[in-house]
Amino acid sequence: MVSHSGLLTVMERAARKAGSKLRRDFGEVEHLQVSRKGPADFVSKADKQCEKTLVEELQKARPDWGFLLEEGGVIEGDPTKPRWIIDPLDGTTNFLHGIPHFAISIAVEEPLYGGKRDITTGLVYQPVSDESYWAEKSRGAWRHDQRLRVSARRDMGECLIATGIPFMGH
């Protein structure tokens, strides 16, 4: 079994707590209040509640860190400390259409000399399947405890490529 860093443990714990609420809301998706942020860019009460839970849980663990939030903008923290980057419901279109492929995404961005920043840790948690994908700088990428590898294939005709593009209504 691969050991997580303390940071990843904090991230996964927060994602699982928020994910349990998303699972519940996913079962009640037809009753959610939905508004539009922009063309084909929906935000639901579930987005906002999930983000609130994540912020609360992560602030408990790292109270002086800031946040860059998809729904809530920026919450300033100590500029010499890392900050959290959060997409509380990555795949809102799928969620709102009853398609069980959506996730909670959390990253850690470390401050560097000269005002630059570097993303060093990331976690993607899929609440419906209870799967976690994570990566840490210099440790590689993982699905649960299984190391992920880059394919050696070079011919695009031999590759499997998938993408999701939400409907862009005009």
Please tell me what each predicted stretch does.
Residues 1-89:
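N-terminal subdomain of lithium-sensitive/metallo-dependent phosphomonoesterases centered on the IMPase/IPPase/PAP
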Residues 12-16, 47-48, 102, 119, ...:
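Hydrophobic alpha-helical segments
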Residues 22, 47, 58, 92, ...:
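Residue-level signal for inorganic ion chemistry
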Residues 28-30, 38-39, 63-64, 98, ...:
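Glycine-rich, flexible loop/turn motifs
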Residues 77, 97-99, 154-156:
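Short coil/turn motifs at beta-sheet boundaries
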Residues 80-128:
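Glycine-rich active-site/cofactor-binding loop and its immediate structural neighborhood
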Residues 107-170:
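Acidic beta-strand-loop-alpha-helix segment within the catalytic core
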